[in-house]
């Protein structure tokens, strides 16, 4: 079984300390980080826990928000070995200019479907690329996709 905390803690600090965070909620806000992590029921067939991870990444001064949004699609394919993007399309609801990327990959023997929503958020001083990435086993996708959409549609990121 995946130990999400052991993956996130070295990179972002304690995973349980991410609830109710905003891009500007701590002294490391310009560096970005984990805003929220949600875990679902483990898929016993693959011993895999589905997750939704919301990240804030600062956009460098020499990069426009539009460039960051476009480049984030390429980064997704580069960051996940074997990732095959199936869709990269505008997300029809708020936030404005959001993109939805979906794809698949194999992790060991586990077939995974990933959905990533990406959009730009400003805290008034800095621009951030926000990504909400849902991962689940491909067989579980048909059972979980409505729950994931409900969570994504209810998310609200506020400045701290």
Regions of interest found by a model, annotated:
Residues 1-60:
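Secretory pathway targeting signatures of secreted, lumenal, and periplasmic proteins
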Residues 60-63, 67-160:
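Short, well-structured beta-strand
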């Amino acid at each position: 079984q995946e130990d999400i905390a052991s993956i996130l803690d070295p990179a972002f600090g304690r995973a349980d300390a991410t609830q109710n965070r905003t891009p500007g909620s701590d002294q490391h806000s310009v560096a970005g980080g984990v805003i929220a992590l949600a875990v679902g029921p483990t898929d016993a067939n693959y011993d895999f826990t589905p997750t939704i991870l919301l990240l804030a990444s600062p956009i460098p001064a020499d990069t426009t928000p539009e460039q960051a949004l476009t480049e984030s699609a390429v980064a997704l394919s580069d960051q996940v070995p074997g990732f095959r993007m199936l869709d990269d399309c505008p997300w029809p609801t708020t936030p404005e200019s959001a993109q939805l990327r979906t794809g698949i990959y194999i992790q060991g023997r586990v077939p995974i479907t990933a959905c990533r929503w990406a959009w730009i958020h400003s805290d008034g001083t800095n621009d951030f690329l926000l990504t909400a990435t849902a991962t689940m086993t491909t067989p579980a996708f048909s059972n979980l996709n409505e729950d994931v959409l409900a969570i994504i549609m209810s998310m609200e990121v506020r400045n701290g």
